């Protein structure tokens, strides 16, 4: 009898490294997770230790196999998904980083971004990389490291230093320095990559003074990049055959591989991506144009919108307002009242993301009357997550001309049935919640498995995609639009709050 085979997905996130073992039916067999240190050298600066990222990720890989009681020769392939934009520069010879990883959340390169804007680069960057000028993306982080570590730019020109996002760093370590690659999805988040020519952009490299010699080779999201030995000693060599940035991996894990399919991930914030097929749609409504995975890991394009406060607003109800003891309580209290009694909560604690991009907006509660109680405020806070998702979807539909028929959802907050029903109500479209909630890891596993023939094609994967529950709109169009108009009025009044009058 042949031994049963499995796929391992490595999910390297912002606060923890995880490894997930899946079988041929896409069932999760075991999970291992390790958190690592968040480093805050100055206000607004965020770093990770790349060696700690590697140590936690490699140990979860060994651990997860031990937990599942399977041997390395039962692993058909490994897929990697990762926090995007986080930037690492290391020595080619020794494999030692020359500086800590600069994390996607880090704002230290705001001044470099202001220079780019003053130099009139906004339109070029939008047209060629699909992005907006923001410290979020990798390009300015690489420049900062080369500007601040003495002699590093010259060393990079001589080919002594390498740059990579987290996927590139992990593969370099897993292959003992034999393979220096990234995939199209991660490259598209660097602000150094031309999403139309599918190559590093010479003008961006010149403007940021980044030597091409230090950049990884860019490959498809589903192919064999190299092989690794788990534990580092002899034994079976396992192919590494899937890579995707976390949000694109979730899009693929939800099997949103056709034009017009979309998913929303409800975490601390919300990330909504819509596959636009082979067409890169330039956004006129505050969204990003990015690369996604097509049916066999080839290049598709997507529109992406990020909402800053989703689960974080529920944490605020719990930690600061003390209105609930646990995030799970929010559903119970929200359903104790029939409606919000006219209340709208705009959770713009750190400004507003897509499609408004207003850093001066601040959180506000509107419509308070003597009859408003805590349950109304809890309900209005939950509803704000759904309203913000509609804001992003309206922008997507305006940009793409595509009408959404169903939204696939994942992330912690999708367990909240009240929120999912209200999301369907306010969008006027079906909301589909999958049985397997680990869709980011699932996406990495699918990409890796397809590359080595573990799964033959997407049709085979579609059979495994079980929708656990479907939510359908339960309110009339007039009611939907009336409520949404109230939200838009509230947002307008919360905007520009911190802007100082002359």
Curated annotation (Swiss-Prot):
Lineage: Bacteria, Pseudomonadati, Pseudomonadota, Gammaproteobacteria, Enterobacterales
SUPFAM superfamilies: Actin-like ATPase domain
Protein name from the UniProt record: Glycerol kinase
Gene Ontology terms: biological process: glycerol catabolic process; glycerol metabolic process; glycerol-3-phosphate metabolic process
Gene field: glpK
Kinase recorded as keyword: yes
A GO-annotated cellular component: cytosol
Pathway of action: Polyol metabolism; glycerol degradation via glycerol kinase pathway; sn-glycerol 3-phosphate from glycerol: step 1/1
Record text on activity regulation: Activity of this regulatory enzyme is affected by several metabolites. Allosterically and non-competitively inhibited by fructose 1,6-bisphosphate (FBP) and unphosphorylated phosphocarrier protein EIIA-Glc (III-Glc), an integral component of the bacterial phosphotransferase (PTS) system.
GO terms for MF: ATP binding; glycerol kinase activity; metal ion binding
Organism expressing this protein natively: Escherichia coli O127:H6 (strain E2348/69 / EPEC)
Residues at which ADP binds: 14, 18, 268, 311, 412, 416
Ligand binding (glycerol): 84-85, 136, 246-247
Catalytic activity: glycerol + ATP = sn-glycerol 3-phosphate + ADP + H(+)
Positions with a binding annotation for ATP: 14-16, 268, 311, 315, 412
EC number: 2.7.1.30
Job of this protein: Key enzyme in the regulation of glycerol uptake and metabolism. Catalyzes the phosphorylation of glycerol to yield sn-glycerol 3-phosphate.
Keywords for the protein's UniProt record, in alphabetical order: Allosteric enzyme, ATP-binding, Glycerol metabolism, Kinase, Metal-binding, Nucleotide-binding, Transferase, Zinc
Annotated binding of sn-glycerol 3-phosphate, by residue: 14, 84-85, 136, 246
Annotated family: Belongs to the FGGY kinase family.
Subunit structure comment from the entry: Homotetramer and homodimer (in equilibrium). Heterodimer with EIIA-Glc. Binds 1 zinc ion per glycerol kinase EIIA-Glc dimer. The zinc ion is important for dimerization.
Record's signal peptide: none
Gene3D superfamilies: 3.30.420.40
Cysteines engaged in disulfide bonds, as pairs: none
């Amino acid at each position: 009898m042949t031994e049963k085979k499995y796929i391992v997905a490595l999910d390297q996130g912002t606060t923890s490294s995880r490894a997930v073992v899946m079988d041929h039916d896409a069932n999760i067999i075991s999970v291992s997770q390790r958190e690592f240190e968040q480093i805050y050298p100055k206000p607004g600066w965020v770093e990770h230790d790349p060696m700690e990222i590697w140590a936690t990720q490699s140990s979860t890989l060994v651990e997860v196999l031990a937990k599942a009681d399977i041997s390395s020769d039962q692993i058909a392939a490994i897929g990697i998904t990762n926090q995007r934009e986080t930037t690492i520069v290391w020595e080619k010879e020794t494999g030692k980083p020359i500086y800590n990883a600069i994390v996607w959340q880090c704002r230290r390169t705001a001044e470099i971004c202001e220079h780019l804007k003053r130099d009139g680069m906004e339109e070029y960057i939008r047209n060629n990389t699909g992005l907006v000028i923001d410290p979020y993306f990798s390009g300015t982080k690489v420049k900062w490291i080369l500007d601040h570590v003495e002699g590093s730019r010259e060393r990079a020109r001589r080919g002594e230093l390498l740059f990579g996002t987290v996927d590139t760093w992990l593969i370099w370590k897993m292959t003992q320095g034999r393979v220096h690659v990234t995939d199209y999805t991660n490259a598209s988040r660097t602000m150094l990559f031309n999403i139309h020519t599918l190559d590093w952009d010479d003008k961006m490299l010149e403007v940021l003074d980044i030597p091409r010699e230090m950049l990884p080779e860019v490959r498809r999201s589903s192919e064999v990049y190299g092989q690794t030995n788990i534990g580092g000693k002899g034994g079976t060599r396992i192919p590494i055959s899937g890579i995707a940035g976390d949000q694109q991996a979730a899009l693929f894990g939800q099997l949103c591989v056709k034009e017009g399919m979309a998913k929303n991930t409800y975490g601390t914030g919300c990330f909504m991506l819509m596959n636009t097929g082979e067409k890169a749609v330039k956004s006129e409504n505050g969204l990003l144009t990015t690369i996604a995975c097509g049916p066999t890991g080839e290049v598709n394009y997507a529109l992406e919108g990020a909402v800053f406060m989703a689960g974080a607003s529920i944490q605020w109800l719990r930690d600061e307002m003390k209105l609930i003891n646990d995030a799970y309580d929010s559903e119970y209290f929200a359903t104790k009242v029939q409606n919000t009694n006219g209340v709208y909560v705009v959770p713009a604690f750190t400004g507003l993301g897509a499609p408004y991009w207003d850093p001066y907006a601040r959180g506000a509660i509107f419509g308070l009357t003597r009859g408003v109680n805590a349950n109304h405020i809890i309900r209005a806070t939950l509803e704000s997550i759904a309203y913000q998702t509609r804001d992003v979807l309206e922008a997507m539909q305006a940009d793409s001309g595509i009408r959404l028929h169903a939204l696939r959802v994942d992330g912690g907050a999708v367990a909240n049935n009240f929120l999912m029903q209200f999301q369907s109500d306010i969008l006027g479209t079906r909301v589909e919640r999958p049985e397997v909630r680990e869709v980011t890891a699932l996406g990495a596993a699918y990409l890796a498995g397809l590359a080595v023939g573990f799964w033959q094609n997407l049709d085979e994967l579609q059979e495994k995609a079980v929708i656990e529950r479907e939510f359908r709109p339960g309110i009339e169009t007039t009611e939907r639009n009336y409520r949404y108009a109230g939200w838009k009025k509230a947002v307008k009044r919360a905007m520009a709050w911190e802007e100082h009058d002359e």
